[in-house]
């Protein structure tokens, strides 16, 4: 019998093989390809017919792995077409190092025990209202946005939603924008659920990834917390996707296969016919537009959890504040910093990008240092050093008449 086998490579079509094995769509198999052996998946359609008569090769074996779901296959077909990549490259995102993992010993999954412990955390009335609006009991596709200020308890709300999903035997995925957030987030998860989640990102060892991949495929692992790539894990019974900090630009992958993980998560939820929650303090423009059109539902947390007070802050308008000579900090800021330093307190300055100054002005004539070719502001990097070029050698700037020592510049 003939079978269409999609391989994790640059081809946009499956290859036809023959076998006497009892195979169905989604089964993982090992096949000959050239002079090597490669893992592929029985796909849902054959390659386009041609007039050439090829001698078909025989499938070596069927792997003892839970088959890839038909809904996942449909998602990968759509993903490849939408992002203009070969279907084989889309499949490569699912397979671990271009292979499926056979793990027969179930004791390796003991660290990811599924028995949830009872916690004493109680939701506020506002949080309970948001949880009800999520409507997770309705196991159908819908996008819900949970918006709340920092410290409003958004995490506890969607943890509660996820808890109900796990109790029903489903699996959940929590997407985070940055790898650095996973370790801190893991502690919160352990405190709430009493179980260890599977952490997935590029920094995880190959052996650990093999265990997680297999555990997700056979349903032993119930919750995965990960970066963009975790979206392509072969979940056996996915029930809920949560995208934390949905507005974060880190969800966009710009190297290799380019895609927006937030948007692809919404699409995967649609193919799986499951709910997805977007968590944010400030919705992205795309999300806001969909809320306005009524495509996404939304609930808001206006108060901080347990009525915690907001930090005191003050905006200092530099247009109305006279600065000291040779200084770009107002006297009020300097006095505040000095008062804390006198008390042996610590002071932290947040800069919105690398470099000492992303916007360099001449303090005498207020000339703005920018690239003459692209108008991007030049960045001051080292104290006493020129504005070092970092992107293009074409960014040469004539020195300011007031500061002849400032010459060559560059931008980020």
Segments (PLM) and residue ranges:
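Alpha-helix N-cap/helix-start and coil->helix boundary motif
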Residues: 179-182, 284-285, 355-356, 368
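Accessory, non-ATPase domains that flank or precede helicase/AAA+ motor cores in DNA-metabolism machines
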Residues: 1-280, 287-288, 292-308, 342
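Conserved interdomain linker/interface between the two RecA-like ATPase lobes of SF2 helicase motors
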Residues: 268, 275-277, 284-290, 295-363
């Amino acid at each position: 019998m003939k079978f269409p086998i999609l391989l994790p490579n640059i081809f946009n079509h499956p290859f036809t093989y023959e076998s006497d094995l009892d195979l169905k769509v989604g089964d993982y198999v090992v096949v000959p390809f050239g002079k090597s052996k490669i893992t592929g998946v029985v796909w849902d359609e054959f390659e386009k017919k041609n007039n050439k008569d090829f001698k078909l090769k025989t499938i070596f074996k069927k792997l003892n792995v839970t088959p890839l779901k038909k809904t996942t296959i449909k998602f990968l077909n759509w993903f490849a077409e939408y992002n203009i990549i070969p279907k084989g490259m889309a499949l490569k995102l699912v397979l671990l190092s271009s292979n499926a993992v056979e793990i027969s010993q179930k004791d390796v999954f003991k660290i990811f025990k599924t028995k949830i412990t009872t916690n004493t955390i109680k939701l506020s009335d506002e949080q309970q209202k948001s949880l009800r609006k999520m409507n997770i009991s309705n196991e159908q596709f819908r996008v819900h946005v949970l918006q709340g200020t920092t410290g409003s308890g958004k995490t506890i709300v969607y943890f509660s939603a996820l808890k109900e999903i796990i109790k029903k035997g489903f699996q959940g995925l929590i997407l985070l924008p940055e790898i650095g957030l996973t370790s801190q987030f893991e502690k919160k998860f352990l405190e709430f659920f009493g179980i260890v989640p599977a952490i997935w990102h590029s920094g995880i060892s190959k052996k650990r990834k093999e265990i997680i991949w297999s555990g997700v495929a056979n349903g032993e692992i119930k919750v995965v917390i990960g970066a963009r790539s975790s979206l392509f894990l072969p979940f056996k019974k996915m029930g809920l996707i949560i995208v934390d900090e949905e507005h974060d630009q880190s969800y966009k992958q710009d190297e290799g296969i380019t895609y927006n993980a937030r948007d692809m998560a919404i699409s995967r939820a649609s193919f799986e016919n499951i709910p997805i929650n977007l968590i944010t303090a400030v919705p992205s423009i795309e999300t806001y537009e969909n809320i306005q059109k009524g495509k996404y539902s939304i609930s808001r947390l206006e108060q901080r959890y347990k009525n915690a007070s907001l930090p005191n802050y003050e905006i200092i308008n530099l247009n109305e504040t006279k600065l000291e000579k040779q200084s770009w900090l107002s006297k009020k800021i300097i006095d505040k910093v000095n008062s804390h330093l006198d008390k042996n307190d610590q002071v932290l300055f947040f800069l919105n990008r690398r470099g000492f100054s992303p916007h360099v002005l001449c303090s005498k004539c207020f000339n703005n240092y920018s690239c003459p070719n692209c108008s991007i502001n030049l960045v001051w990097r080292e104290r006493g050093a020129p504005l070092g070029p970092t992107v293009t050698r074409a960014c040469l700037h004539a020195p300011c008449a007031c500061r002849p020592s400032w010459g060559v510049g560059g931008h980020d």
